[in-house]
Amino acid sequence: MKSLIPLADIMKVSGEELELLTGKESLEEGAWALLEQGVSLAVVTLGARGCKAFAPGLSLEKPTYDTKVKDTTGSGDSFFGALLARIIQSGKRPEQLSPEELGDFLDFANAAGSTCATKTGAIPALPTTQEIEACRRNVPLLHV
């Protein structure tokens, strides 16, 4: 797995995966280690604490949504799929995104992961765009 890092433009990892891949206990040091290997955007998911994203010259932290969790199966995939969809829809490479755009995309991804966790199963729990937007409008952010 480590040998593939230089081939990735965008990586999404959990805090535990980051330490395993980089050997760094510090979240920031681990993310910067990925960037030093050629990753353009490193996103670390932190469960109830939301996520942190790192790109050259940029670090953003976004809280997640305060939903009633039933099953987290598929939440990470939902998060990453939503993030990738937004980046692709923007027509920009990760390094071309403004901090505001990236922040909005991360918020959308957090809403996708949070919404997924309100249902059981993996594929059946994947939220629609409408469900994600409803979460963003109606569910308060979780500040841990």
Which residues make up each language-model segment?
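Conserved phosphate-binding/catalytic region of the ribokinase-like
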Residues: 23-144
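Conserved beta-alpha-beta core of the PfkB/ribokinase-like small-molecule kinase fold
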Residues: 1-32, 49-50
